[in-house]
Every structure is written in structure tokens, then in C-alpha cells.
Amino acid sequence: MFGLKNFFKAAIFLSLLGGLTLYIIRQIQYQSDIMPFEQYNPPSTLIVEENPITKAKYPFIDVHNHQFDMPLKDLSKLTAEMDSLNMAFMVNLSGFRGLYLKECLDNVKENAPNRFGLFVNLDWEEIDSPDFMENNLAILRKAKEDGAIGLKVYKGLGLTDVDSNGKRISIDDERLDPIWEACGELGFPVLIHSAEPASFWLPKDKNNERWLELKQKPIRYRDPKKIPSFESILAEQHHIFKKHPNTTFINAHLGWMGNDLTRLGNHLDSYPNVMTEIGAVLAELGRQPRSARQFFIDYQDRILFGKDSYNVAEYYTYFRVLETKDEYFNYYRKRHAFWKMYGLDLPDTVLRKLYYKNALRILPSIDSSLLPID
């Protein structure tokens, strides 16, 4: 017989079951309204003037580019793309060394003799070898003789490169001093990429502005328990700038200080032998148009145009940020910038210096006939 006690038990059970069912239904409904952050990219409803640009206002020199197949590359196709952008000259930082570098230079000399420059690259991990310095100074001299125009230092130095004992090689290791000095003597600018965005050292959580990039590219995370801090790596880099005032350094990617232009300005004030460039950090500039515009005006003799990874369509965003007054438009890669861009509307005098004049000053072997005569 179904008694009162059992009735209450059944009522409680059904009530709990109903509540659980309602909870599950609501969770399903809630989850159905959730999308991954990567997918959320609604078209803007803002109606403002738009001035997309596919060709730079002035011929420009790209001082930060990578072409990894230069010995065999069809340069006629590449130069046609460059012409479409108004790119007068490209610096390929991935020249490597030895026979590879020679084959790169031979291809350029035969097929596009005045459109490309090659930077040589060195291997730091042989630093303990007795003939390390002799070999590397010989590489630099031979590269200069063959037609290379500078030295590119990759981020491995200071981050991941180690000596024969497994010890990290610091950027300011005194054993490398003769190389920096030799570059000054040879007239080789040193484009050096040190560290990464500071956010790569921070916890991968909701407070990290680079969370999406670290999610999509987890290898970029820098564990502070295993890797020297962002600030210590920058300090090593800045130390060589101070120690070698007769060598011209190009601090790549705005020295990862594009989010703090006051600091970057102080940095340039401290080291007159240092230039900087904007490769892969346009997103920092496009979100602070007033500050960035003033920075470009104040330091117009110290900034070079660079792009880094080569993609024709991505240059369009660079031109639009640098040349227009456009508001609230997309950057081309969400993991670098989930925010919108604003144009800096740089003055023509500043644009000319950014696009080609500053590069010509530190890379005088570039054929100036490719560029306007002011």
C-alpha cells in the first residue's frame, strides 16, 4: 500500500528530478548560445569614411622580411608583387651564410640586381669552439665581400641558444663583443630580435591580453620558472647597444615596447646608435593613434618600415594605418589584435623617412635611383 511516507519520498524525488531536468535544459540552451572567441567576429555597424589602400603612397624599403627559398626563388614573380605594393627594395633577413648566402646573392645579381639585400646569419652555439671567433669574423668579411648588407640576430640568442655545457648564451656575453665591433667596422647594421611580447611570460588566463595567441600557439609561452624574465633579456640587449656605440643596431619589433611609447622614446634617447622598426607590431600602433602619431613625428629619424612575414594583402593594413585617418577597422590577424585599428594620418615628411629615407641612410648600398629625389 502506497503510504503517506512513500508519497512524500516520491514527491521529493520527482521535484529533484524536475529541477535537474530543468537545469540540464537550461545548460544546453546556454551552451548553444556560446561560441569560441575565435569565431566571434561580427561585422561593424559603424558607418564611417573608409579609405582602403593597396599601394603605398611612396616607394618603400622593407627592412624586415623573410624569404627562405631565395637561391631558387622566381624573383620576377616576387618583384611584380613588390611593384604592385610600391615596394622599391626588400631586405631578406634570412640569408643564412656560406654557400646558401652566396647562392641567394647570385640569384639576386642575375635576376633582380637592385631590388634585394641580404643579411647574413651566424650560429652562436659553437661559442666554446677555439676557432669560433676566427670563423665567424671570416663569415662576416666574406659576406660583405659577396654583397651582403647586414647581420640579422634571431631571438634564440638570449632565449634558447646554449653553449656546449647547456648554459644559456646571454646576448651580452663578452665573447661576442668582437662580432658587434666587426659589424660596425664593416658598415653592417645589426637587426636584432630579442625576447618576445612581455605577455608571453604572464599566466595564460583571462587577464592576459595575448591569451588567444598563446592558446593557438602554445609554444610561444615563456615559463618564467625556466626562462629568464622579459626585463632581464631586454637589459642584456640594451647592454650591447651601450657597449658598442660605433655599431648601428636595429631593435626589431619596436623592441617589444610598442605598448609603452614613452619607454621606447626614452630608449631611443639613451642609445643614439639604435634604430627601430615596426614589423609585426602594427597592432600596437593602430590602437593608440594620437600617441603613435606624435611618436612617429618626434622620432621620425629613428623608425624604419618593416613587415616581417611576407603576405601581399597584409601590407594593405600597414598602409591604411600609416597613411589614413580611418577609424575602427580590422587588423588582419585576430590573435595579434582582437581590437580595431585607427589611422595615424602621418605627415608626408614623416612617411618619406619611414618608407625609405631612414633606410637609405643606414643602408647606403641601396640603389637610390629606385626612390624619389626630394
Model regions: which residues?
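Acidic-and-aromatic substrate-binding clefts and catalytic sites of carbohydrate-active enzymes
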Residues: 67-75, 92-102, 125-134, 161, ...
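N-terminal Sec-pathway targeting helices
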Residues: 1-17
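Active-site gating/metal-coordination segments in enzymes
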Residues: 101-220
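Hydrophobic faces of well-ordered beta-strands that scaffold small-molecule active sites
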Residues: 61-65, 89-92, 116-121, 151-153, ...
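Active-site gating loops and adjacent loop-to-helix segments of metal-dependent hydrolytic enzymes
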Residues: 33-39, 57, 162, 198-225, ...
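An N-terminally biased module of ancient metal coordination in phosphate/nucleic-acid-related enzymes
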Residues: 24-114, 358
